[in-house]
Amino acid sequence: MLNTTDYLIIALYFLIILVVGVLTGRKQDREEFLISGRKLKSLQATTTIFSSRIGAAILLTYTALVYMYGLGALWYFIGSVFGLFLFYFFGVKVKKMADEENFYTLPDFFFFLKGKFAGYLATLITIIITFGWVVLNFTAGAKLIAEYTPISYDFSVIIVGVIILLYLLAGGFDAVVKTDIIQTIGIFLLFVLMIYLLITTDTKPGLDFMDLFSLPAMQIISFFLAGFFIPMASPELWQRVYAIENKKHFRRSLFLSSLFYLIIGFILLLIGLVIREDIPDIAADTSLIVGFSMLLPAGLAGLSVVIIYSSVSSSADTYLFTTSASVTQDFLEKTGFAKKKENLRLVMRYSMLGLMILGITMALILRDIVDATFFFVSLTMSLGFVTLAIWIYPRLNRHSVNLSIFACLIGVIIPAIIVGISESLIIYAWGFCIAGILIGILINYIRPARL
């Protein structure tokens, strides 16, 4: 449990990010509210890319996978490294196109290249994916608070959602970027705590190279594909690419954020192996939280609450804003429900409020972090695979694009209902994506579509 000092630190953190959000929101125009005026420099871009990626999906889910599967979970990170390396080259092209066409969201890429139907399908997937990550991070933040304090899980979910909503309503995307700088400092403090734990613990993580191949082949493929395709279909990463000032800052920030991400991932692997050895038979999805509470000294354990919460918060605010942007710009504006001459910031604020309420409700229902991650990562495959296909072959016909996205949606939801949620959903998603493209090629041969 936390002491008075710990509670004061948490309260101070909440106060700082709220003040930053309010001050950021003053005298903003539409472009600044939506995408920071497309003028992010290397430092801002590096911190916001890095901190948005170090959320529940990496801190809790990845540690849970290490706790369950040992060194074999590293395949997820190996896939991520390859995916980020590929995105380094792809992102340059996207950046150039976004600057010329004024893109704001990932679906804008599909609207521009493959038409309205593909754009709306991409919008549907984007909203589901990003909202899923909102729920996942709400759940993670609430479990963290409930583990360390007398506050119940249900009330913790409300606290997490309301705090994030308040500074987003005030400052928009600029608030996300500026609070990410604060939260990146917290993540580096977490890095220091993890190093301290590795040095002081009597248990040393065992790294046997052959343990990488101890998993069944299908699990290895699933973990690798999950990591590989995420950058190509991460709406929040695309939004940051659009917001960066130029290609030079893009290349520098993506390289640095990827390097920091890789370092944190390796340290988390070691921490997960230590917790797996020292504290068997605990719930995997809270293994990092429980591990810190039991293995760190009392004062440092309290500090870890603030740091882990700041990491989860930095992802939750990103995904909530990205979801709201896609709902408002890709759906309400493009379908005519919201007129462009209307106050877009007001519409987005109502959207964020509605999404926050829905997110809290879903977080009260869906409490398994690992299963939720597999489900939403599988849906990510639909956009990631098609985006890669379009990059490799820009003339890919619209039938293939539309059917691949739609087939993946079916190929994830139906097996999840019938078979259940596991890492095998990623293989189903991959297979249905390929099938959709092939069927589209056949249909296009019979009835050619516009490119």
Segments from the language model and where they lie:
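Membrane-embedded helix-loop-helix hairpins and adjacent transmembrane boundary segments
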Residues: 1-451
